[in-house]
Regions:
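Acidic (Asp/Glu)-rich catalytic clusters
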Residues: 20-22, 74-88, 115-120, 190-194, ...
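CE4/NodB-like, metal-dependent polysaccharide N-deacetylase domain
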Residues: 107-128, 166-167
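Short acidic capping loops at alpha-helix termini that bridge into adjacent secondary structure
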Residues: 29, 87-91, 121-125, 174-175, ...
């Protein structure tokens, strides 16, 4: 099956909803994702797919060092510019600092490499991909263990953030932001930054069955634009992020019902909900490889396709009586990023996100770690289940 269909008509980029960042910059609400979900077939087609997305009207590209394809995306951008589809100033290109480069001295070289790979002189947005240096190699299985992983340590993060602000001042990056923050870690960051150096954007998991409504409202109140990845429930996510407890957004009865009522597909219903959130002030990232799907994903950011009643069926109305379809169905548990104490003390799937192990300083974490090891040894000696396990 051919992915690219040049007979599919493009969308006028001026029709796509724009979100205003804190400094006044306009950012297209809909971003074309470039993560290929460790899928080699999609990886091979990525250059043509991104060029086609630009032809069809996408102007916001969501990239990352961790996706290992920024050179490919860069070739697509270059091809689109050389063929007259777009000029650089019309694009909003976003990339992310990978966890492996979370030492202060590595931040600027990492950005320079991203710019080289993308063939650009500047980024419109640069994010800290995750709030700590824990990482897994691309394609890792779900049970991989990083023995050097640590929890969120605020003083360490702020050293990285200082380098991010230097990049902004240099002009190599127009705006800076974060990804995968919790509300608590975001509160700490905002506490310790001035107006110029605040993040203007936070990318986070958002889809109909995982809406994070309180956090979204908090970010907007702080003039930080929230934007969602896994906007369709990521049906092709890597195996390490698949668990029996997960639910499929597009198969939910309400999503199916609204699709039937409107004549839209389930993906279009999900993205229309994303588009209409908070008066069109929440961004979304979606990846597709066929021309028809690329266009339909983008088109959702051009119109109010859901009636108020249909929107409320998905979103709820803010009352306890009508919570919508949000089931707190988080897809990224992040177990590949767990630090020793998260595993040591009986972690659960929310350990990465529930803020029970975040620390202001390295000294605070060191004290906690010593106590945790001692506690675990006593626990292992005395608790019935653990005595059996280790006997």
């Amino acid at each position: 099956m051919d992915l690219i269909n040049k007979n599919v008509e493009s969308i006028d980029p001026a029709m796509v909803t724009q979100i205003r960042l804190a400094d006044g910059t306009l950012m297209p609400q809909a971003a074309m994702g470039t993560f290929h979900s460790d899928n080699p077939d999609l990886e091979a087609a990525m250059e043509d797919v991104i060029t086609e997305a630009i032809r069809l009207g996408y102007r916001h590209l969501d990239c990352a060092t961790a996706y290992q394809n920024e050179e490919v995306v860069g070739r697509a951008i270059s091809k689109a510019i050389e063929s007259g589809l777009v000029i650089r100033e019309e694009l909003f290109v976003l990339s992310k600092l990978w966890n492996k480069n979370m030492k202060p001295e590595e931040v600027i070289p990492a950005l320079d490499q991203t710019l080289k790979d993308l063939g650009l002189e500047y980024l419109d947005m640069y994010l800290v991909h995750w709030p700590w240096p824990n990482y897994h190699e691309p394609g890792s299985a779900g049970d991989v263990v990083n023995t050097h992983a640590v929890p969120y340590i605020h003083e360490d993060f702020m050293k990285v953030w200082e380098k991010m602000t230097e990049l902004k001042k240099s002009g190599k990056v127009k705006n800076i932001g974060t990804s995968n923050q919790t509300q608590k870690t975001m509160e700490l960051l905002l506490r310790d930054t001035d107006h110029f150096n605040r993040p203007s954007y936070n990318q986070m998991e958002l889809h109909p069955l995982f809406q994070q409504q309180d956090f979204v409202k908090y970010l907007i109140s702080e003039k930080v634009v929230p934007s969602g990845y896994m906007s369709l429930g990521s049906p092709r996510r890597p195996g390490r992020d698949r668990f029996a407890e997960h639910q499929a957004d597009m198969l939910h009865p309400i999503i199916q019902q609204v699709a039937g009522e409107t004549g839209m597909t389930p993906p279009e219903v999900c993205l229309s909900w994303a588009h209409q959130r908070e008066q069109n002030n929440v961004g979304y990232v979606a990846m597709a490889e066929r021309s028809e799907w690329i266009k339909s994903n983008l088109a959702c950011a051009t119109k109010e396709a859901l009636s108020n009643n249909q929107y409320i069926k998905i979103n709820g109305d803010g009352s306890d009586e009508n919570l919508g379809i949000n089931t707190n169905n988080r897809l990224i548990w992040g177990q590949v990023f767990f630090w020793p104490e998260a595993r040591l003390l009986g972690h659960d799937r929310d350990m990465l996100w529930n803020d029970v192990q975040i620390f202001e300083t390295e000294l605070d974490y060191h004290k906690f770690r010593q106590a945790a090891v001692k506690f675990y040894e006593i626990w292992k000696e005395t608790a019935v289940d653990l005595r059996i396990k280790y006997s």
